[in-house]
Amino acid sequence: MESIGIVAPQKMHFTEPLPLQNGSSLAGYDLMVETYGTLNAARSNAVLVCHALNASHHVAGVYADNPRDIGWWDNMVGPGKPLDTDKFFVIGVNNLGSCFGSTGPMSIDPSTGNPYGATFPVVTVEDWVNAQARVADQFGITRFAAVMGGSLGGMQALAWSMMYPERVAHCIVVASTPKLSAQNIAFNEVARSAILSDPDFHGGNYYAHNVKPKRGLRVARMIGHITYLSDDDMAEKFGRSLRRAEGALDAYNFNFDVEFEVESYLRYQGDKFADYFDANTYLLITRALDYFDPAKAFAGDLTAAVAHTTAKYLIASFTTDWRFAPARSRELVKALLDHKRTVTYAEIDAPHGHDAFLLDDARYHNLMRAYYERIANEVNA
């Protein structure tokens, strides 16, 4: 199916201070927003799509001045696609602390005239949800037909259903978890350590030195990317293949240059990421991942944490996702069913690991299409 076509982002400015979970507040801030489709007269067909770590408000479509910059979930959102923009008004919001136009470490601190850098406050999933709620208010949307997200975006969708139960009809959580495991926190710590130990980091104030801690960002991305793929997927894509010119002998070089195809792939991904992403943003977002644990306020009891939810849920996981394994989704499903919530759960047999939520898998997309048809029928009832 074709893309939704040319889209244009908009910047929303908010002057009312935003209270943050750390006890401080953000006095004034911008959020980058993109919308697709048409909001109906009743304002009842809106869907909020929450983004994952390195994504943004640019969910679907292309920009007129850069047609190669395709939205990160373009295969999911658009006319005739599972989230059909002929039926729904879809909103993408770039979260606070990001590096794609919303207020973050790269933004100018009005009190100093310099980039916030390391002084930008640590933000949480809950802070993002509160900021997104203000975007909804600007559109006059009192209740979303659905809030949807994959990975970290799924955590935001879950948080929406818990923080604003009266504003969410359906909550769609894909390849996500109600909290990070110790192993996942450990992966994030190793990635952050790579950035913090880069000589170009300068305590987070590298903008003043006109440098970027690219070496640390490369390693951080390489670590992360390994966790996004399954072992079978990596074996199929790369195996133990060596990088060799055509006709060259299949022999080792006995040095530390790139020899295996998988090494080349990881370095390419790391280089690409370091060119466009911001190191301070990476630190902030991974820490927000670490902190997300809505059951913490209930002595670790997830069932108690979801007691006041009212939404209907679609929870989807992928069999080869070892970053956020299906067991984590089943834990959430059980907690919701303990309160007799309406829950649809799908555990999809897909070989691509955590990144499967971004791919065009027929079973996965058919599930989403059918679920959104159900929501459309409710909206139009």
Swiss-Prot record:
Binding site for substrate: 221, 355
GO molecular function: homoserine O-acetyltransferase activity; homoserine O-succinyltransferase activity
UniProt site positions, description: Important for acyl-CoA specificity: 323
Gene3D superfamilies per record: 1.10.1740.110, alpha/beta hydrolase (3.40.50.1820)
Assembly information from the UniProt record: Homodimer.
Role, per record: Transfers a succinyl group from succinyl-CoA to L-homoserine, forming succinyl-L-homoserine.
Name of the protein in its database record: Homoserine O-succinyltransferase
Species this chain originates from: Paraburkholderia xenovorans (strain LB400)
Gene designation: metXS
